[in-house]
Amino acid sequence: MCDSPATTGKPTILFIADPCETSATLNSKAFKEKFRILRYQLDTKEAFLNFLERHEQDKICAIYAGFPAFKKIGGMTRSIIEHKSFPRKNLKCIVLCSRGYDGWDLDTLRKHEIRLYNYQDDENEKLIDDLKLHQVGNDVADCALWHILEGFRKFSYYQKLSRETGNTLTARAKAAEKSGFAFGHELGNMFAESPRGKKCLILGLGSIGKQVAYKLQYGLGMEIHYCKRSEDCTMSQNESWKFHLLDETIYAKLYQFHAIVVTLPGTPQTEHLINRKFLEHCNPGLILVNLGRGKILDLRAVSDALVTGRINHLGLDVFNKEPEIDEKIRSSDRLTSITPHLGSATKDVFEQSCELALTRILRVVSGEAASDEHFSRVV
């Protein structure tokens, strides 16, 4: 589970998640000479604190939290950070491989001057050769593209019927809920439609939202609108994307959109943003895709909208009570598409996120972080 106590005076990096073992940084001579590596598999909060107590003599200068971070033990809370065994004296930073940072007591980290870094690849990192800019946004956008296509064309539902029937004619007729020849465009009282020329509203236009917009515009031929608290003039001018302010005025504009993609972060302000009032203003037959956080959707209101036809398709990569997936969502395979929070789950992102996290540690410990902390430092 863990290494033995330190026998050298080198600063220690605690890994609570497995890094990419082939990482160039991890395996570099400079990294190995500079740091001692300590590994621990999280189990319970009490076991973790006991582990830290046994390693109080180690100079833990950084924690590599990877993707799962401290979710298994209830997050990085004040009670952990201010526990007598927590290495506040030497700990300079905690690094994540994910964009999200739910479950962190940011105020307490700030109080004790412990930096938290998340994954960002929107600017170059000179310590990494061949960094792929916007990789995570690109890969999450692929997920959005699939869910949007599912909404318009229902390919997975047709695939299911094809496997069940073993006959192309029967599969199409079963989808149409009629006997005789079926062209394939009918699904009961719904139709498979082309996304070309349809209007899509993207809620949030950060690095992920922008990549979603590019793929939907240039890949599917959709007309892009975006909604946030302030206009991105560069995108509005260069790409002719139409801006809408994220406030009460958005309700009167929702009727025009065939699809809405949520890429907003989970905050108190965005919780249940997609509620009954929001959906009542939407065009019947809406395709709704959520890549942000599960709690942005009021699940009861969304479920009711699926029943009434206000929503024709719901695509989810994040869920309200994650890791659990609501039974109603799972069982409605004709009206929903679901992926298990894997929008960014590619080999490319896994490897690059590790390199970026390790270079953050190198920069912070060496005192060089100030030049680039504006694009990946949380606190």
UniProtKB/Swiss-Prot annotation:
Catalytic activity, EC: 1.-.-.-
Enzyme class per UniProt: oxidoreductase
InterPro entries registered for this protein in UniProt: D-isomer_2-hydroxyacid_DH, D-isomer_DH_CS, D-isomer_DH_NAD-bd, NAD(P)-bd_dom_sf
The keyword Oxidoreductase is assigned to this record: yes
Record Gene3D superfamilies: NAD(P)-binding Rossmann-like Domain
CDD domains noted in UniProt: Mand_dh_like
Domain of life: Eukaryota
Active site as annotated: 293, 322, 341 (proton donor)
SUPFAM superfamilies in the cross-refs: Formate/glycerate dehydrogenase catalytic domain-like, NAD(P)-binding Rossmann-fold domains
NAD keyword on record: yes
Binding site for NAD(+): 207-208, 291-293, 317, 341-344
Gene Ontology terms for molecular function: glyoxylate reductase (NADPH) activity; hydroxypyruvate reductase [NAD(P)H] activity; NAD binding; oxidoreductase activity, acting on the CH-OH group of donors, NAD or NADP as acceptor; phosphoglycerate dehydrogenase activity
UniProt keyword terms in alphabetical order: NAD, Oxidoreductase
Any one Gene Ontology cellular component term annotated for this protein: cytoplasm
UniProt miscellaneous comment: Present with 1430 molecules/cell in log phase SD medium.
Family according to the record: Belongs to the D-isomer specific 2-hydroxyacid dehydrogenase family.
Database matches in PANTHER family: 2-HYDROXYACID DEHYDROGENASE YGL185C-RELATED, 2-HYDROXYACID DEHYDROGENASE-RELATED
The protein's name: Putative 2-hydroxyacid dehydrogenase YGL185C
